[in-house]
Amino acid sequence: MLAVNYTNLRDNMKHYMDQVTDDYETMIVTRKNNKNVVILSEE
């Protein structure tokens, strides 16, 4: 499982979206106030 902060995700969106879909990874996006989000591939 990957973990990335919101700013890094925003700056490198294509890279992380490709990594999630190509490698079937699940990604946690860390945000302020512990309002984290999980991103996963639909496939």
Over which residues does each language-model region extend?
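Small, basic N-terminal interaction modules of short regulatory proteins
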Residues: 1-43
